[in-house]
Amino acid sequence: MAGLTDLQRLQARVEELERWVYGPGGARGSRKVADGLVKVQVALGNISSKRERVKILYKKIEDLIKYLDPEYIDRIAIPDASKLQFILAEEQFILSQVALLEQVNALVPMLDSAHIKAVPEHAARLQRLAQIHIQQQDQCVEITEESKALLEEYNKTTMLLSKQFVQWDELLCQLEAATQVKPAEE
């Protein structure tokens, strides 16, 4: 009975294919898609019987279909001993994950606290404070640059004063030396 319904489904699919190829009321004449499919099947059979590589490929296609079957994994199920070895090999990792999950579980009440729930209410205030902070950072940069310029001016002035004092000291030494020489002439 099931074979009959499969045959009917196949025949319906071939008729639908003929409608696609020839159109809904197409002039197909005596030509049928099934005849063309049979010819293709015979040609492929002839080719495969002549070529050894094609025979090997046909055998591999059957294996590939078998391996792609989702139930294949269930048929070659892993023994319980192997599953146990997998679990034991990952024991330390599993225990560390359990400890982390317990920590998260312990911290859940803190996430539900009133302080965390009030965060959206404080968002506008936080944004205003962030803007003030940015303005203060800009002011700080300006003050730093002004201070740097003032320090450079101070250093230049100090350097010039030092040079001037050195020149005055040299001039004073020369004048003192000249005054000491004159009293010896008397």
From Swiss-Prot:
SUBUNIT field: Subunit of dynactin, a multiprotein complex part of a tripartite complex with dynein and a adapter, such as BICDL1, BICD2 or HOOK3. The dynactin complex is built around ACTR1A/ACTB filament and consists of an actin-related filament composed of a shoulder domain, a pointed end and a barbed end. Its length is defined by its flexible shoulder domain. The soulder is composed of 2 DCTN1 subunits, 4 DCTN2 and 2 DCTN3. The 4 DCNT2 (via N-terminus) bind the ACTR1A filament and act as molecular rulers to determine the length. The pointed end is important for binding dynein-dynactin cargo adapters.
Species annotation: Homo sapiens (Human)
What's the protein called, per UniProt?
A: Dynactin subunit 3
What is the annotated role of this protein in its UniProt record? Part of the dynactin complex that activates the molecular motor dynein for ultra-processive transport along microtubules. Together with dynein may be involved in spindle assembly and cytokinesis.
- Superkingdom field: Eukaryota
Q: Mind listing the UniProt keywords for this protein, alphabetically? A: Acetylation, Cell cycle, Cell division, Centromere, Chromosome, Coiled coil, Cytoplasm, Cytoskeleton, Kinetochore, Mitosis
Chain segments annotated as transmembrane = none
Q: Which of the residues bear the PTM N-acetylalanine? A: 2
The answer on whether this UniProt entry bears the keyword Cell cycle reads: yes
Q: Which family does it belong to?
A: Belongs to the dynactin subunit 3 family.
Any Pfam family hit: Dynactin_p22
The protein's matches in InterPro entries, at most eight in alphabetical order, are given as: DCTN3
What is one GO cellular-component annotation here?
nucleolus
Establish whether keyword Cell cycle is in the entry: yes
Q: From which residue to which does any coiled coil extend?
A: 135-157
Q: Name one GO molecular function term.
A: structural molecule activity
Where does it reside?
Cytoplasm; Cytoplasm, Cytoskeleton, Microtubule organizing center, Centrosome; Chromosome, Centromere, Kinetochore; Cytoplasm, Cytoskeleton, Spindle
UniProt note on tissues of expression: Ubiquitously expressed. Highly expressed in muscle and pancreas and detected at lower levels in brain.
What's a BP term from Gene Ontology annotated to this protein? cytoskeleton-dependent cytokinesis
